[in-house]
């Protein structure tokens, strides 16, 4: 019985991400599209990321969120880095 309860808790935790198809994600998050839409935290330093310009018309991002403020998504490595987002 304890095993069944543990399995149920794991399943509930893995599916508890807020659906964002019709809802707005909170501060510090974005709506990332996998097989379903889920609110996810903004990407941090060295995390994989999407560029802000890559948002769909509905404001969703494919797979990864853009970087948190102060960072930009390097389109060569698709990771969040410090510095200017302009190409040099």
UniProtKB/Swiss-Prot annotation:
<dbReference type="InterPro" id="IPR020202">
    <property type="entry name" value="Atracotoxin"/>
</dbReference>
<keyword id="KW-0964">Secreted</keyword>
<keyword id="KW-1015">Disulfide bond</keyword>
<feature type="disulfide bond">
    <location>
        <begin position="20"/>
        <end position="31"/>
    </location>
</feature>
<feature type="disulfide bond">
    <location>
        <begin position="67"/>
        <end position="80"/>
    </location>
</feature>
<feature type="disulfide bond">
    <location>
        <begin position="25"/>
        <end position="39"/>
    </location>
</feature>
<feature type="propeptide">
    <location>
        <begin position="86"/>
        <end position="88"/>
    </location>
</feature>
<keyword id="KW-0732">Signal</keyword>
<feature type="disulfide bond">
    <location>
        <begin position="30"/>
        <end position="65"/>
    </location>
</feature>
<feature type="signal peptide">
    <location>
        <begin position="1"/>
        <end position="17"/>
    </location>
</feature>
<comment type="similarity">
    <text>Belongs to the MIT-like AcTx family.</text>
</comment>
<dbReference type="Pfam" id="PF17556">
    <property type="entry name" value="MIT_LIKE_ACTX"/>
</dbReference>
<feature type="disulfide bond">
    <location>
        <begin position="49"/>
        <end position="73"/>
    </location>
</feature>
<feature type="modified residue" description="Pyrrolidone carboxylic acid">
    <location>
        <position position="18"/>
    </location>
</feature>
<dbReference type="GO" id="GO:0005576">
    <property type="term" value="C:extracellular region"/>
</dbReference>
<protein>
    <recommendedName>
        <fullName>U1-hexatoxin-Iw1b</fullName>
    </recommendedName>
</protein>
<keyword id="KW-0873">Pyrrolidone carboxylic acid</keyword>
């Amino acid at each position: 019985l304890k095993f069944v309860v543990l399995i149920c808790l794991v399943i509930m935790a893995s599916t508890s991400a807020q659906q964002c198809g019709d809802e707005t994600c909170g501060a510090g998050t974005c709506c990332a599209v996998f097989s379903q839409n889920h609110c996810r935290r903004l990407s941090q330093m060295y995390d994989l990321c999407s560029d802000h310009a890559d948002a769909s018309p509905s404001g969703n991002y494919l797979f990864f969120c853009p970087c948190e403020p102060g960072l930009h998504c390097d389109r060569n490595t698709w990771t969040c880095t410090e510095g200017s987002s302009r190409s040099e």
